[in-house]
Amino acid sequence: MKEEIQMRNLKRALSLALASVMLLGMMVIGASAVSINDFTDQDEIVNKEAVALLVDLGIVNGKSDTNFGATDTLERTALAKMVYIALTGTDDASMYADMNVFSDVTAANCWAAGYINYCYSVDVLSGVGGDRFSPYSSLTVAQTAKALLVALGYIPDAEISMYEGNDWAINVMRDAQANRLLDGIGQSAHSPITRDNAARMIFNALKAEMVTPEYQYDMGTQYVTKYNGRGVTLGQSTFGLVSTSALVTGIDTNGNAVLD
């Protein structure tokens, strides 16, 4: 059993380090019940490193234990759960389940109620109008990018970041490009984002630096003059992930990667 766990940790570390992306430095995240190798449709997954990491962290699940659904479009419920876990490091959102923010999202009729209510409370996701959230609707590339930018610390208010109004998608895609959230995506702003590309965008967000807005006031109106980097990525803040380009040569008796 110990050898099996060590082998799993080694494969995890190899897939991360050889791709010059992220490494679980302390290996503090427990082994997931499902890995990318359990998906029978893994040949359809283009962003394998991204999916492997996110499944390992518990951020992303398959449509079932054996099907990831790489080419399926991402639903609003799924993004709410992914962003919640990426920000909190846990999948338990029960304390938010009974907030009853939207008429079509309650603990009784929507499995993602807690995730949705939390994301609404921190401005990551908003409703679609008429007191509704439309939990099972698909998301576009720009909508997903906006949620992740807000998760990184960007302010969604129209007066501050122009993430609302007629040009919101242009402004979101500009900032998403600057933060490299769109690396490897290959879809236009208003295209329904696939689950595969959503995993890649969240993977990119984990590597992006979190920011803090710097405010000024003009005639009683508050606005952001700039965003200051916090010196920590989203992945490091939540999961202790660190970037590395080192080669993994083995794994020690404690299950930690040995780097060259």
Positions of predicted regions on the chain:
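Calponin-homology-like cytoskeleton-binding modules
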Residues: 119
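Alpha-helical segment that forms one wall of the substrate-binding/catalytic cleft
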Residues: 142, 146, 196-203
